[in-house]
Swiss-Prot record:
It comes from Lactobacillus helveticus (strain DPC 4571). Its main location: membrane. This is ATP synthase gamma chain. GO terms for biological process: proton motive force-driven plasma membrane ATP synthesis. NCBIfam families: ATPsyn_F1gamma (TIGR01146), PRK05621.2-1 (NF004147). F-type ATPases have 2 components, CF(1) - the catalytic core - and CF(0) - the membrane proton channel. CF(1) has five subunits: alpha(3), beta(3), gamma(1), delta(1), epsilon(1). CF(0) has three main subunits: a, b and c. GO terms for cellular component: plasma membrane; proton-transporting ATP synthase complex. The gene is atpG.
Length: 320
């Protein structure tokens, strides 16, 4: 058999084997995607209930404070409230009171620990480098808490201040596994390492699409503080022991932890979806390549057979 035919056969066998590997990797990613999606649903329900409870508790205290001051209870005055006047100095006010004179901003950035996930990691890095540049333009120091080795290594190579690094988060992370990460982030904020914290991650939309998100995590700003929430709290008619402030001192850190955990879980879901899509594309490409190589092989065989037949006929004619 000519060398060209042997070479084509080897290429076809090699590509088929690669296609089997990428298909297996696609199936693994699909399984992990289903697991993280299921876990994400349960987390979302829990976190929404905690947020509503906190919003109602804070709203009731804010409205009571405005009434004591004999101030109009409206959106404008609620927005101007100083939480230290309501809750005093402590964790509650620290976690919800916007800081003045921002000097340093923390970014908890979630990337992957490996490749073969399409444009997942490159999109995270590209977006973050632009954000860092904008933040520095405002005169703010940039401090990064990197979850995932791809982002961490890139940032350190490009002289970004990485103050915390966590690699090897499991493909379907549990709350207990992520707890040291989020506890460190909250502790750094409360200790003044940075004045505000943003969580930056890839949000999973569906199996084919995702969206990069930058969400302010600390101080907590996604609460619904208003008269409506205060009235909803009163309608429940339950007593709080020992008092609302002490309850909030427990609930607010817990809410921050669960919210950051949710972002990491969401990012893992998006990573698995990106990996699944990339492996599906690789498998499809392998099939197309096998088809093209098989066509070339068949044509080469046909040409070889035609040549051999021609030689036989020519030889027979020569003997006549």
């Amino acid at each position: 058999m000519p060398a060209s035919l042997l070479e084509l056969k080897k290429k076809i066998a090699s590509v088929k084997q690669t296609g089997k590997i990428t298909e297996a990797m696609r199936m693994v990613s699909a399984s992990k995607l289903n697991q993280t999606e299921d876990r994400d649903k349960g987390y979302t329900i829990y976190n929404n209930h905690v947020r509503k409870t906190i919003s109602r508790l804070i709203s009731s205290q804010v409205v009571d404070s405005l009434r004591e001051q004999d101030v109009a209870i409206d959106k404008r005055n609620i927005a101007k409230i100083d939480y230290t006047d309501v809750f005093g100095l402590g964790i509650t006010a620290d976690m919800i009171q916007p800081r003045k004179n921002i000097k340093s901003t923390g970014f908890l950035v979630v990337s992957g620990d490996r490749g073969l996930v399409g444009s997942y990691n490159s999109n995270v890095i590209k977006n973050m480098m632009g954000i860092f540049e904008d933040e520095r333009a405002q005169g703010h120091d940039v401090k990064v808490l990197a979850v995932g080795s791809v982002g961490a290594q890139f940032f350190k190579k490009n002289n970004v201040n990485v103050v915390y690094e966590k690699n090897g988060v499991s493909d379907v992370p549990t709350f207990d596994e992520v707890l040291p990460i989020v506890s460190t982030a909250i502790k750094m904020f409360l200790n003044g390492v940075f004045d505000q914290l943003y969580v930056c991650y890839t949000h999973h939309v569906n199996s084919l699409s995702s969206a990069f998100r930058v969400e302010k995590m600390l101080p907590i700003v996604d609460l619904d503080i208003g008269v409506k929430e205060a009235e909803a709290h009163r309608e429940l008619e339950y007593d709080i022991e020992p008092d609302p402030n002490r309850v909030l001192m427990k609930l607010l850190p817990q809410y921050a932890r669960s919210t950051i955990y949710g972002a990491i879980l969401d990012a893992k879901t998006a990573e698995h979806a990106s990996s699944m899509t990339a492996m599906q594309s690789a498998t499809d490409n392998a099939k197309d390549l096998v088809s093209n190589l098989t066509t070339k092989l068949n044509r080469a065989r046909q040409a070889q057979i035609t040549t051999e037949i021609t030689e036989i006929i020519s030889g027979a004619n020569a003997l006549e």
